[in-house]
UniProtKB/Swiss-Prot annotation:
The basal body constitutes a major portion of the flagellar organelle and consists of four rings (L,P,S, and M) mounted on a central rod. Pfam families: FlgH. Keywords: Bacterial flagellum, Cell outer membrane, Lipoprotein, Membrane, Palmitate, Signal. This is Flagellar L-ring protein. It is found in: Cell outer membrane; Bacterial flagellum basal body.
Length: 231
């Protein structure tokens, strides 16, 4: 019996350990910098004044618009949500049935236990009250900046950007990852764009090390908070 208990305990421990989300690792290929493509040399047109691939713009800026270009994203995320719910149900009912006379005569019957006369009247009262309330609130904020690269230019001119930033501290590593779609018109003249202007944004802020582990519950605590705990 003791051996079976040990096996079950170890199996549960390994199962709970496997449910823990893996720690993020650097050098994720998805967030790796995208280098600009080397353009193929344009065919030279002998005898022409203008050659393809050598054009310049009279009015141009330094904003990102090609694959491999760098763009700085200003993190300005702030969310706040609250919800209140309450309900109340009340119901009262009563009934009074009195049978004092029937066909002009008094109606009564003898009590089989005491022998005394008793009437046939009845009275009923009932009430029910039910009430409940609930409240929930959540707020988050993230500020800072991260510089990423343009990974793809869509046919409509939308820029797909992604990148990550790792910071090594004395208690571990902190990382910020972001991916999404940026409209070229939303890019400022200093080549920055706010994170609130990114479509389909995927923003991750996480970390590794002793500080990150201290904020996570242990494997036994996760068992008590899991659906496997019957109480």
């Amino acid at each position: 019996m003791s051996r079976l208990l040990i096996v079950v305990s170890l199996s549960s421990a390994f199962a709970l350990a496997g449910c823990v989300a893996p720690a993020p690792k650097p050098n994720d290929p998805y967030y790796a910098p995208v280098l600009p493509r080397t353009p193929l040399p344009a065919a030279q047109n002998s005898g022409a004044i203008y050659q393809a691939g050598f054009e310049t713009y009279l009015y141009d800026d330094r904003k990102a618009y090609r694959v491999g270009d760098i763009i700085t994203i200003t993190l300005a995320e702030r969310t706040q949500a609250s919800k209140n719910a309450s309900s109340s149900i009340s119901k009262d009912s009563s009934a009074n049935i009195g049978l004092g006379s029937l066909f002009g005569g008094a109606v009564s019957m003898a009590n089989p236990l005491t022998g005394n006369s008793m009437s046939l009247g009845a009275e009923y009262d009932a009430s029910r009250d039910t009430s409940g309330s609930g409240q929930a609130g959540q707020s988050n904020s993230l500020s800072g900046s991260i510089t990423v690269t343009v990974s793809e230019v869509l046919p409509n001119g939308i820029l797909a950007v992604r990148g990550e930033k790792w910071m090594t501290l004395n208690t571990g590593d902190e990382l910020v990852r972001i991916a999404g779609l940026v409209r070229q018109d939303d890019i400022a003249t200093d080549n920055t764009v706010s994170s609130t202007r990114i479509a389909d944004a995927r923003i991750t802020y996480s970390g590794t090390g002793a500080f990150a582990d201290a904020s996570q519950p242990g494997w036994l605590d996760r068992f008590f908070m899991s659906p496997l705990w019957p109480f």
